[in-house]
């Protein structure tokens, strides 16, 4: 039995769906009503990471875990890893981030992810880390501005990033969960090319068949917007991450998707064509 966490998110949803197509899968969900993965082989345990009793129920009889955590202010990786060790789990595949490999990345979120990875190592459960670059699906946050005004606003227009389709990240994770020889490995995962926000805007314009305008926000405006949504350390982490991207730190392409799945990573032009409806006027 494989336990999937984060199954309402971009990657966890895909991991759960792929596993459910092949056999039984268990999902730990704080809000089960938000799950889109259904089926006779899908078992759902309601609970949060801070609920040890729910964790113990979810982990009973489980061989492997796909772990996704989202709140860098909470010790959720440590909680799950400790419970997994107590339950005798044989493999824990954690969704991390490629920035942990960058020596100059010292923002709050990246530091916490390094600490989270170490907590998993320290648990004694055999581990695999999947470290993706920025998700292509993050551009869905542009949809309201595109639909209402035909405009994309982002901090830097010409900062390249080798963004990756969440489905490719999920495929790598499933390969690690169901294959052999992945324990003790960390897999960086990128898309097939580095692309800028301005280039993404142009691609979306082609897909939608309508002109789109790109507007660069500037640091002050971006900080104001982020501070309205996130705690200060998290908001500042996003700004520092964007600055690293501006200097080219996120442009490297790696062949992991091809190596682990046998097919090339999807480019942004394919992702945008498949998700055009999300950006189309209502």
From Swiss-Prot:
It holds the Pfam family NmrA. NADP(+) binds at residues 6-11. The keyword Mitochondrion does not apply. Its EC number is 1.3.1.113. GO terms for molecular function: oxidoreductase activity. Keywords: NADP, Oxidoreductase. Signal peptide: none annotated. The keyword NADP applies. It catalyses: a [(3S,4R)-4-alkanoyl-5-oxooxolan-3-yl]methyl phosphate + NADP(+) = a (4-alkanoyl-5-oxo-2,5-dihydrofuran-3-yl)methyl phosphate + NADPH + H(+); [(3S,4R)-4-(6-methylheptanoyl)-5-oxooxolan-3-yl]methyl phosphate + NADP(+) = [4-(6-methylheptanoyl)-5-oxo-2H-furan-3-yl]methyl phosphate + NADPH + H(+). It is an enzyme of class 1 (oxidoreductase). SUPFAM superfamilies: NAD(P)-binding Rossmann-fold domains. Involved in the biosynthesis of A factor (2-isocapryloyl-3R-hydroxymethyl-gamma-butyrolactone), a gamma-butyrolactone autoregulator that triggers secondary metabolism and morphogenesis in Streptomyces. Catalyzes the reduction of the butenolide phosphate produced by nonenzymatic intramolecular condensation of the 8-methyl-3-oxononanoyl-DHAP ester. Belongs to the NmrA-type oxidoreductase family. This is (4-alkanoyl-5-oxo-2,5-dihydrofuran-3-yl)methyl phosphate reductase.
């Amino acid at each position: 039995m494989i336990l999937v966490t984060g199954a309402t998110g971009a990657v966890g949803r895909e991991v759960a769906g792929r596993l459910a197509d092949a056999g039984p899968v268990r999902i730990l969900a704080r809000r089960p009503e938000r799950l889109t993965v259904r089926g006779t082989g899908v078992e759902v345990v309601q609970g949060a990471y801070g609920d040890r009793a729910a964790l113990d129920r979810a982990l009973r009889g489980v061989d492997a875990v796909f772990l996704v955590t989202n709140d860098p202010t909470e010790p959720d990786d440590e909680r799950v890893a400790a419970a997994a060790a107590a339950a005798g789990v044989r493999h824990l595949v954690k969704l991390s981030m490629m920035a942990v490999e960058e020596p100059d990345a010292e923002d709050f979120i990246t530091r916490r992810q390094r600490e989270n990875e170490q907590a998993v190592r320290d648990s004694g459960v055999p581990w695999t880390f999947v470290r993706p670059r920025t998700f292509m699906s993050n551009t869905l946050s542009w949809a309201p501005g595109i639909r209402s005004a035909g405009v994309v606003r982002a901090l830097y227009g010409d900062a390249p990033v080798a963004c990756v389709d969440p489905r490719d990240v999920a495929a790598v994770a499933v390969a690690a969960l169901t294959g052999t020889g992945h324990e003790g490995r960390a897999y960086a995962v990128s898309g097939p090319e580095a692309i800028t926000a301005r280039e993404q805007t142009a691609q979306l314009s082609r897909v939608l068949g309508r002109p789109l305008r790109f507007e660069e926000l500037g640091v002050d405006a971006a900080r104001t917007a982020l501070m309205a949504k996130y705690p200060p350390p998290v908001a500042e982490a996003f700004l520092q991450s964007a600055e690293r991207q501006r200097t080219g730190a996120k442009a490297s392409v790696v062949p992991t998707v091809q190596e682990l799945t046998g097919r090339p990573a999807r480019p942004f032009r394919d992702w945008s064509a498949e998700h055009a409806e999300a950006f189309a006027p209502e």
